Amino acid sequence: SKDANFVIEHNGEYFTAISWVEGETMSYILANAPEPADVSNIYHDLGIALAQFHQAADNWQPPAQFQRHKWDRNGLVGEQPVWGRFWDNPDLLPDERYTLIKVQDQMNEALSHLEGTLDYGLIHADLIPDNVMIDQGQITFLDFDDCGFGFRLFDIATILLK
């Protein structure tokens, strides 16, 4: 901070900066990638970094009081998902609400059959290209406020869809 404080409180929220991360965001690099092979290489390197992150998380022993979101079936599409009841958004039109409820039901059903077979552990949960910095091939993940326990495919799906 300007005052050399490592933890800053603003409007009841706390912010920290550990160190500056050099490089460009993945979104910037993808927008300026000259060749499809460059994009392929970026995603390849990202996959390696993500696997290393998940493996490190599996080898980490969290402190006894460690609590994070659960991005499991209930946390994603249950009655009280982590990010709220998306189907109850007051801005939705009736047919949009109906569609989201239908998708929620389908996802709930699909995950009920898959959840025991999917790799589950600590995930980033917000791995969008703006939260990935790349500097001379070195990949750094940013913004861990949504980090929690969930399906590892969630991280892969997020980076591919965003």
Give the ranges of each region predicted by the language model:
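Structured catalytic core of nucleotide-sugar glycosyltransferases
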Residues: 1-18, 71-77, 122-125, 129-134, ...
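ATP-binding pocket architecture of kinase catalytic cores
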Residues: 1-62
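Short, well-ordered alpha-helical segments in soluble proteins
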Residues: 25, 50, 54-57, 61, ...
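A cross-family kinase active-site recognition segment
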Residues: 36-95
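Generic structural concept
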Residues: 44-47, 104, 124, 157
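Loop-centered beta-sheet repeat module
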Residues: 78-125
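Active-site acidic catalytic loop and adjacent metal/ATP-binding pocket
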Residues: 108-154
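Active-site activation/catalytic loop segments of kinase-like enzymes and analogous catalytic loops
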Residues: 153-162
